[in-house]
Amino acid sequence: MALKQFNPTTPGQRQLVIVERSGLYKGKPVKMLTEGLSSKGGRNNRGRVTARFQGGGHKRSYRFVDFKRLKRDVLAKVERLEYDPNRTAFIALIRYEDGQLSYILAPQRLGVGDSVVAGSNVDVKPGNAMPLGNMPVGTIIHNVEMKPGKGGQIARSAGAYAQLVGRDHGMAILRLNSGEQRLVSSSCFATVGAVSNPDHGNINDGKAGRSRWRGKRPHVRGVAMNPVDHPHGGGEGRTSGGRHPVSPWGKPTKGKRTRSNKATDKFIMRTRHQRKK
């Protein structure tokens, strides 16, 4: 789907660039595949702010998206493509041959009326899910499991994909969008194709209100605060903060590496920090 620009009839429309969504379904989602979602405003169960700059926004209902594709070797037909306010990608409503309805992440080049299936020996075409061990090397994939049966975790946002670049001793070698190369079990399932809505990265909200509609509040810089509120705060006139960037609690930020999961280091063949070639 293409990008849509507007005539500058108002200041908010002058810079506005959105994704043209005329091909998506305009009705309500399937009720049995949705559930209520309460707005947290960035607060935890004690009422304390644990995630700053969140709150407000339009009311949402959560769509149950099938990341596991456990219904194997049963053909399903794409009924429609839908907008999902809870993620950047579009979702597809599929109807299995036995009549069951389900939502899946919509890959690029998947249209209404197309057939999809999950299984061990299925065709390599967008929307079909299969184990990494049964895919040809070089396949573009998304919604990749990290543990067999756990459900897809890698490459789920708009336009994202990973590539199967090799196999080694029962493991599949994946190249991710970030440049990282990592090992995943060959029995893990993945879906063929790249995630829909690749133009999401090119949108321009045009005005602050569009961010507020999504539940995002203004992101205040530390140097604009008082010393009581932030380590970068205070000073006469505008200052640069006077030290390396830190969080409001004094921890280094902006590029400081925080990964500490040594147990899974052995699965990362090439980190995303190494220069991409």
Swiss-Prot record:
GO biological-process terms attached to the record: cytoplasmic translation
Task: Outline the segment boundaries, as ranges, of region: Disordered.
Answer: 222-277
Keyword field: Ribonucleoprotein, Ribosomal protein, RNA-binding, rRNA-binding
Q: Name one GO molecular function term.
A: rRNA binding
List the GO terms this entry assigns under cellular component, sorted alphabetically: large ribosomal subunit
Instruction: Write down the InterPro entries for this protein, in alphabetical order.
Output: NA-bd_OB-fold, Rib_uL2_dom2, Ribosomal_uL2, Ribosomal_uL2_bac/org-type, Ribosomal_uL2_C, Ribosomal_uL2_CS, Ribosomal_uL2_dom3, Ribosomal_uL2_RNA-bd_dom
- Functional summary from the UniProt entry: One of the primary rRNA binding proteins. Required for association of the 30S and 50S subunits to form the 70S ribosome, for tRNA binding and peptide bond formation. It has been suggested to have peptidyltransferase activity; this is somewhat controversial. Makes several contacts with the 16S rRNA in the 70S ribosome.
Q: Share what the entry says about its subunit structure, partners included.
A: Part of the 50S ribosomal subunit. Forms a bridge to the 30S subunit in the 70S ribosome.
Family according to the record = Belongs to the universal ribosomal protein uL2 family.
Per its UniProt record, what PANTHER family does this chain match?
LARGE RIBOSOMAL SUBUNIT PROTEIN UL2M, RIBOSOMAL PROTEIN L2
Name-wise, this protein is Large ribosomal subunit protein uL2
What is the organism lineage in this UniProt record? Answer: Bacteria, Pseudomonadati, Pseudomonadota, Alphaproteobacteria, Hyphomicrobiales
